Amino acid sequence: MKTVSFLEFCKEIEKRVIGQEEVKRVCYNIYHYLELIAKGSRKSLPFILAAPSGCGKSETYRAVKDYFNKELHFLSCIYVDASELTEAGYKGNNPETVVNGLLERPNSNGIGIVFLDEMDKKMIPSYNSMGQNVNAAVQHGLLTIIEGREVTATNHSEVRVNTNNTLFIAMGAFDFVRASKEEEKFISLGETKGKRDHFDGITREEMLEAGAVNELVGRFQSIINYHRLTEESVRKIVDLNVKELSEEFDINIFVRDDVYSAMYAVSNGKFGCRLLKSILRERVQAMDMKRKLCGKSAPPVAFILNGDGDCCLEYEDVC
């Protein structure tokens, strides 16, 4: 990491992951891992990224992967859907398959970042016909891999990967915990009874209560939580998406002020910014299709979006 400063790395990721202050901690943990690898240390520091749906979890992975593909192309950034993992000996992907992607880089010796997405899905008990908790078995299978050991790659029987050199980042929305937060009533001194926030941070204790294996949760050094987006952050996200749509459709798009208020409410719903992006795209596509069906050959001067999610066209007067 001699050629890349932490500040530079962090700023680049924050251009993509907007409005999440805790993304700095994600960047720091990754940067510190690479510093340790550069020193020859085998001390990996796995962590959990808990983020409500649509708040930047997947974008964090994509931003980190894109950055290292450009700046440190020798470093593998692997995506694994943990919800597809099965207990060793059963049909499907057993826990050891999580290292297979590291073999795409020759002589990696296990150096790389493995993003275990949907890890929260494996922390909920799931029982087979014999009453065995199969998800607990998967968690136990991941234990020593995350802690660090040599693993024989399932698709290359002659190759062994040392996961002491690997950084594991478990990711999840933890919707099952958030649902219980919303249902739970609590009373504090001087406060009235009310519901807890869907966007409150997830704790180790809540993971354990939901069914996570204590030993596995303990292997992760820290939990990083993403939170509710601010109005300023939503404005930036709307502007960024509008810019991308303008370039894609080769038009100018103007956004009225009430759009930002409407999109703020959308962004902090249970679907997050993912729904915001879908709404903007659907409205622009619908109006572009209408324009083309009407036989308008000249591009419109502007699509104007309003807070109801509708838009209208304004054409340049060429007469």
Protein language model annotation of sequence segments:
Residues 59-62, 169, 175, 264-319:
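C-terminal engagement/docking regions of AAA+ P-loop ATPases
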Residues 53-55, 67, 83-87, 119-122, ...:
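Conserved nucleotide-binding/hydrolysis micro-motifs of P-loop NTPases
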Residues 30-31, 210, 232, 236-250:
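Conserved AAA+ ATPase "sensor/coupling" helix adjacent to the nucleotide-binding pocket
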Residues 3-46, 287-292:
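Pre-Walker A (pre-P-loop) alpha-helix and adjacent loop at the N terminus of AAA/AAA+ ATPase modules
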Residues 35, 39-80, 104:
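Walker A/P-loop
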Residues 2-26, 83-92, 228, 232, ...:
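Dynamic helix-loop-helix/coil hinge segments at AAA+ ATPase domain boundaries and subdomain interfaces
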Residues 78-109:
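Short glycine-rich substrate-engagement loop in P-loop NTPases that contacts/grips substrate
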Residues 59-69, 100-106, 120-232, 244-245:
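Canonical AAA+ ATPase core
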